[in-house]
Regions:
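Paired acidic/hydrophobic, glycine-rich loop segments that form the ligand-binding mouth/hinge
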Residues: 31-34, 215-220
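Glycine-centered hinge/linker elements that transmit conformational signals in sensory
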Residues: 120-127, 168-202, 242-247
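Conserved C-terminal helix/tail region of periplasmic/extracytoplasmic solute-binding proteins
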Residues: 321-414
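Extracytoplasmic/periplasmic solute-binding protein
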Residues: 74-85, 90, 117-174, 214-216
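Extracytoplasmic/periplasmic substrate-recognition and gating elements
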Residues: 194-195, 233-307
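Hinge/lid segment of periplasmic solute-binding proteins
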Residues: 10, 31-91, 135-137, 239-248
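Early extracytoplasmic/lumenal segment of secretory-pathway proteins
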Residues: 1-38, 207
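Short, solvent-exposed loop/beta-turn-alpha elements that line the ligand-binding surface or hinge
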Residues: 54-65, 108-112, 138, 144, ...
């Protein structure tokens, strides 16, 4: 077997798309490739993927976490096209060192961070508290929070409020974008971002924790590997501790958690190559092998029996494996809550990748543009006026109309 790295999964997906479209210089599809469901679905629509049920028995497939394996069934004929190999969900990570200073001064509690609305309230308090540290300089408060993967904010936020933002039937999507519910998402991300309570500067929010620009974020469980051990700014550096919390939910909503992570697809070829590819996937997802991979990656195992902290501890002890402390604590937390967790991910549909990108960038780009407008204000009165304008009902209506149009344009005629 030969393996090839294309950098990130996104880079690999680009290479797969180029292979499908026959781009000049593109390589043939590999026997096995890592893929998110959106891309694998597009490849399957071109009839290029192997139905894995030809090589996996019902008994073998029953060992995988139900919601994970269901993600790979793209059609109504019980054909399986994507096998889960590692998954993740979202958690909240906090710079404990700076949180403790703030909490001691203001009486704030980690319990307040259980809901998105609570995060917004704490973030406002944090901004005002840090602003007060420099009484001779106005409006220099610091942001408290950020989040990775804005699409997850929409998808899981709407699900927690009782709606599927992408409702799919027969590969066709209906957008459930109830204006009042979307307004709640706007009020709890866009508005605090514009006011400076939230922020996003680096590629990932763990980068922003490292530079001291925020002290808390919602991100993938695998991001714990990258949570910094210290804050480094232009004029200081100091060590920090950490806290791992459940990702906040919409107040009053159901406690659904994001299910995410790439799977493995097998390209249609001949029986020999397809069989060998599936045997490799069986080996890779065996409990012991999968748990060893989890130790190195921070992802979650895909077999039911492997999602057990005792099984992980056994593998670590027997193999004398060194595991990142933050990643271990995060995985332990998720595993201990696994049986009671409701995971959720969207179903696949044509142009789903493009629609998801609208969720990823539409609101966050608008918030970033408005925040820059606020920062450019020349005085306090101008600043207040800009914030009022950018966060008004009229501003929301204008954004909402553009957001709705962008989603429709992303999927085209269905």
């Amino acid at each position: 077997m030969e393996s090839y790295s294309y950098g990130s999964v996104s880079d690999l997906e680009q290479a797969v798309s180029e292979s499908l479209s026959g781009t000049v210089g593109a390589e043939d599809l590999p026997d096995i490739f890592s893929s998110y469901a959106d891309t694998a679905y597009a490849v399957q629509r071109e009839d290029k993927l192997t139905d894995l049920t030809q090589y996996f028995s019902d008994e073998e497939l029953s060992k995988y976490v139900d919601s994970y394996i269901q993600e790979g069934y793209f059609t109504q004929d019980d054909s399986l096209y994507l096998l889960p190999v590692a998954k993740s969900t979202e958690i909240m990570m906090i710079n404990k060192t700076d949180w403790d200073k703030f909490a001691s001064a203001t009486g704030s509690s980690l319990d307040e961070l259980a809901t998105i609305e609570g995060v917004v309230s704490v973030a406002e308090k944090y901004y005002n508290w840090t602003d007060a540290q420099t009484p001779d300089v106005t409006n220099d408060g610091k942001a408290f929070y950020g989040r990775d993967a804005m699409a997850n904010y929409f998808v899981i936020g709407m699900k927690q409020m009782g709606r599927e933002i992408f409702e799919v039937k027969d590969s066709k999507v209906t957008f459930n974008i109830d204006k009042d519910l979307i307004k709640r998402l706007w009020d709890n991300y866009y508005v605090p971002y514009v006011k400076g309570y939230f922020a996003a500067y680096g590629k990932f929010r763990s980068d922003d924790v490292k530079t001291g620009d925020i002290i808390a974020y919602t991100g993938s469980t695998s991001s714990t590997f990258y949570f910094p051990d210290k804050v480094e700014t232009d004029d200081m550096s100091y060590p920090i501790g950490y806290v791992v919390l459940d990702a906040p939910v919409m107040a009053g909503g159901e406690d659904y958690k994001v299910q995410q992570g790439a799977g493995m697809a097998v390209t249609k070829s001949d029986k020999e190559h397809e069989y060998a590819s599936c045997e490799f996937l069986k080996w890779f997802t065996e409990k012991e092998n999968n748990l060893k991979f989890i130790c190195d990656s921070g992802y979650l195992p895909v077999l039911k029996e492997a999602n057990n902290i005792d099984e992980l501890d056994k593998i670590i002890e027997e193999g004398s494996i060194e595991v990142n402390d933050k990643a271990y604590e995060c995985i332990k937390k998720v595993m201990n809550e696994f049986d009671s967790t409701m995971f959720y991910t969207t179903k696949n549909f044509d142009n789903g990748y493009d629609a998801r990108n609208v969720l990823n960038y539409n609101m966050s780009d608008a918030a970033d543009a408005a925040r820059k407008e606020v920062a450019a204000a020349s005085d306090d009165e101008s600043r207040k006026a800009v914030i009022e304008k950018c966060t008004s009902d009229e501003a929301f209506d204008e954004w909402y109309d553009g957001f709705s149009s962008a989603l429709q344009e992303a999927v085209g005629e269905q």
